[in-house]
């Protein structure tokens, strides 16, 4: 897949300097495009100059995802576009995004073929169920650094 943004609990406000197509998925999160609410789970065309404001996750889940046609143009590290902030590599300079950062969209929106049909939402039965209770396994790995876990 193409690099996108993982949004934990609260989202950013993004100004698009070029036309794009986005989709917002994952945990339920309100979003507006130039002040008008937009739905999740479907392609949304964005005009150059538009402002996308992503709110705070509500309900089950902690993460939402913003996909952009073509993906974000970030360097790959070991084949991944993910950011690892503790290691200071990957993603956008190996750090969290800050106000004023500019993310470039990879590929060319203009070169993308026209859609055969209009944007269609992902059918509800195909969307993942968001549970309020999770059983998870934990394995020691790079995130096992003292910054994340202590013996207590």
Residue ranges, per PLM feature:
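Conserved "landmark" site that anchors the functional core of diverse proteins
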Residues: 1-152
């Amino acid at each position: 897949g193409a690099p996108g943004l993982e949004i934990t609990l609260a989202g950013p406000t993004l100004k698009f300097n070029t036309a794009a197509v986005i989709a917002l998925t994952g945990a339920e999160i309100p979003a507006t495009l130039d002040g008008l609410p937009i739905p999740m789970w479907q392609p949304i065309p964005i005009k150059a100059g538009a402002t996308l404001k992503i709110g705070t996750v509500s309900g089950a889940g902690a993460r939402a995802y913003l996909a952009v046609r073509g993906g974000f143009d970030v360097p790959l590290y070991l084949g991944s576009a993910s950011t690892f902030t503790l290691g200071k590599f990957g993603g956008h300079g190996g750090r969290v995004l800050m106000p004023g950062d500019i993310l470039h969209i990879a590929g060319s929106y203009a070169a993308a073929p026209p859609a055969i049909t209009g944007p269609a939402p992902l059918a509800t039965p195909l969307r993942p169920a968001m549970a309020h209770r999770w059983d998870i396994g934990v394995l020691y790995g790079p995130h096992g650094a003292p910054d994340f876990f202590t013996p207590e």
